[in-house]
Design a protein with these regions (language model features):
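Flexible loop and strand-edge segments within Gram-negative outer membrane beta-barrel domains
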Residues: 19, 23-61, 88-93, 99-108, ...
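Transmembrane beta-barrel wall of Gram-negative outer-membrane proteins
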Residues: 1-31, 59-66, 115, 121-128, ...
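Membrane-embedded beta-barrel scaffold of Gram-negative outer-membrane proteins
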Residues: 67-95
Length: 190
């Protein structure tokens, strides 16, 4: 197995009440894989692992996030933005024999973007509030190929799976309700 990763984090505070952050990570992994074998239907014991084609798994993952925070008088505004990229490749000798019969490959690419923005009270009073919004988009492109070597034939299936969503939310809290230390919190999300 060969793998490596790198990470970086930068923070900047141009003013007392304003700060920015950037975080990024990168991971790469390359490995052999999948020691499958035929299982005897009578004894239920696995046979010998016997491949003639190299099975593998390769993954690249990159994640980047950006944050911005502003502290106003009696309130704060926070923003979190993220992007993730995944590239995933698998190859499996699926005939479990020394002959070249079947070989499966799966290639997947995934991209995801998200943003969250909120504003909340920072006053020392009994009442505290928070308003926010969140949104995301994710796209997954998956290709599965099965090679039939004995027939010089291959099947290929393509899957495109987008997903997205938006949410809005609010939370109110009243501290020291009826007695010291008792709080009531109400929240709503759409």
């Amino acid at each position: 197995m060969k793998s490596g990763s790198a990470r970086i984090r930068l923070e900047w505070k141009p003013q007392k009440n304003l700060s920015f952050g950037l975080m990024s990570s990168f991971d790469r992994s390359v490995q052999g894989g999948y020691p499958y074998a035929v299982c005897d239907s009578v004894t239920h014991k696995p046979g010998e692992v016997d491949y003639n084609d190299y099975s593998f798994y390769k993954r690249t993952l990159s994640t980047t996030g950006f944050s911005a925070d502003y502290q106003g008088t009696g309130y704060s505004i926070n923003s979190r933005t993220a992007f993730q990229y995944l590239s995933d490749h698998q190859g499996i000798d699926q005939d479990f024999s020394p002959r070249s019969i079947y070989f499966a490959r799966q290639d997947m690419k995934q991209k995801m973007f998200s943003e969250e923005l909120n504003i909340k009270s920072t006053t020392p009073g009994r009442y505290k509030w928070l308003f926010g919004a969140f949104g995301f988009w994710q796209g997954i492109d998956n290709t599965v190929t099965l090679d039939y070597f004995t027939k010089d034939y291959a099947t290929r299936k393509l899957y495109d799976t987008p997903a997205y969503g938006v949410a809005f939310y609010h939370q109110s809290t009243i501290d020291d309700l009826l007695t010291r230390g008792l709080s009531l919190t109400f929240g709503i999300r759409y």
